[in-house]
Amino acid sequence: MKPAARRRARECAVQAIYSWQLSGNSIADVELQFLSEQDVTGVDVTYFRELLSGVAVNAAKLDALMAPYLSRQLEELGQVEKAILRIAMFELSYRDDVPYKVAINEAIELAKVFGAEDSHKFVNGVLDKSGPAVRRKR
């Protein structure tokens, strides 16, 4: 699959995980609604589904992995930043096919697109500190 299709899958995953975090609906319902309502042309839909299910199933583990590296409590994180960091932590922890630098760079780019003004700096800082340890713990 082309890198652009994976990037689009990550962009869609941020939006869907954000919705899941706020709505409390099941990840299956969020996925179904997202795929039926959004244009997924050029999206690696298989990877999108893997990100959604992987983050949903492992959310508590992913949160525990990132917590020591946060400058504030997990509950104080913005929902967009939390979604982006969960995706990056999932890729670093469970996806050997995603190079370390790719996972971090993609998360930074997602934060630039979807996050608040300086959230990409925050995401970069968290992943710069946590990335090596998280990848080693696999």
UniProtKB/Swiss-Prot annotation:
This entry's Gene Ontology molecular function terms read: RNA binding
Q: Which gene encodes it?
A: nusB
Keyword Iron included in the entry's annotation: no
Name of the protein this chain belongs to: Transcription antitermination protein NusB
Record's GO cellular component terms: cytosol
* Pfam families for the chain: NusB (PF01029)
Cited Gene3D superfamilies: NusB-like
Entry-linked SUPFAM superfamilies: NusB-like (SSF48013)
Q: What does it do?
A: Involved in transcription antitermination. Required for transcription of ribosomal RNA (rRNA) genes. Binds specifically to the boxA antiterminator sequence of the ribosomal RNA (rrn) operons.
Q: Which HAMAP family match?
A: NusB (MF_00073)
Similarity comment: family membership: Belongs to the NusB family.
Which InterPro entries does the protein's record reference?
NusB-like_sf, NusB_fam, NusB_RsmB_TIM44
Keyword Transcription regulation among record annotations: yes
Q: Which GO terms describe its biological process?
A: DNA-templated transcription termination; transcription antitermination
- What UniProt keywords apply to this chain's record, in alphabetical order? RNA-binding, Transcription, Transcription antitermination, Transcription regulation
